[in-house]
């Protein structure tokens, strides 16, 4: 986990960081609607898992926006070189297990590690918590394919010093002009603002529209 400490005294967000860090609930969230038609068609043609594809797309976008690589360690802001994935997987008994997947520069390379990681996670009991699933250099992902939600909240321990973004995808919905999917984005306000979430959402949509 390679990271660099940010110089708080010279950081333009110094006041913002200190202001929001004092709050009991420093996270804020928005829900956006993603156009999924091109990604769906591409995955169908290539034989790819759509869910793995949009999880990768979100991670690619997050790594492009520096503030999504910011974390708080020992009360201080740092920036990681690379951010990975920690997602939930549904098990046969309808419970879920945490699954770590390392990011890669291209989708095929990502799949080579993600697929065996997912298989190994499903074989674990309970929540499947490991050192990797607790990594701070990751984004927490969840998928609710049954619900076309318009907003979403997360279970959280306020005493735990969490600063990882949380991204959730919903139900794929067919409409007259194509397919859409809700995506909820929750981030730590001490590390970023709505502008940065907007950058992320645009880059995510751009990736989904690539093919």
Task: Give the ranges of each region predicted by the language model.
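A broad, structural surface signal
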Residues: 41, 52, 56-64, 112, ...
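Helical lid/core segments from catalytic subdomains that handle acyl or acyl-like groups
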Residues: 91-149
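Acyl/amide activation-and-transfer machinery of modular secondary-metabolite enzymes
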Residues: 23-41, 82-105, 180-186
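Active-site-proximal acidic secondary-structure segment that organizes catalysis
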Residues: 108, 120, 161-211
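Flexible, Gly/Pro-enriched loop and linker segments at secondary-structure and domain junctions
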Residues: 1-31, 51, 129, 136-180
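Aromatic-residue-lined binding/catalytic grooves and analogous aromatic/hydrophobic interfacial grooves
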Residues: 3-6, 32, 42-46, 61
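Short alpha-helix boundary/capping segments
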Residues: 46-47, 192
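Hydrophobic "lid/gating" helix adjacent to the active-site nucleophile
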Residues: 48-85, 187
């Amino acid at each position: 986990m390679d990271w660099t400490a940010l110089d708080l005294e010279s950081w333009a967000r110094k006041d913002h960081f200190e202001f929001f860090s004092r709050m009991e609930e420093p996270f804020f969230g928005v829900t956006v609607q993603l156009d999924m038609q091109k990604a769906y068609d591409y995955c169908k043609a290539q034989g790819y898992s759509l869910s793995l594809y949009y999880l990768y797309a979100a991670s690619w976008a997050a790594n492009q926006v520096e503030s999504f690589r910011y974390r708080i360690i020992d009360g201080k802001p740092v920036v990681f070189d690379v951010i990975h994935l920690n997602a939930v997987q549904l098990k046969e008994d309808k419970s879920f297990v945490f699954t770590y997947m390392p990011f890669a520069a291209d989708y095929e390379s990502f799949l080579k590690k993600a697929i065996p990681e997912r298989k190994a996670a499903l074989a674990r009991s309970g929540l499947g918590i490991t050192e990797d699933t607790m990594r701070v250099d990751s984004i927490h992902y969840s998928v609710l394919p049954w619900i076309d939600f318009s907003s979403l909240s997360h279970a959280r321990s306020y005493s735990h010093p969490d600063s990882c973004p949380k991204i959730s995808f919903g139900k794929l919905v067919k409409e007259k002009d194509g397919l859409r999917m809700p995506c909820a984005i929750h981030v730590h306000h001490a590390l970023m603002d709505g502008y940065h979430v907007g950058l992320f959402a645009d880059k995510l949509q751009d990736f989904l529209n690539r093919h």
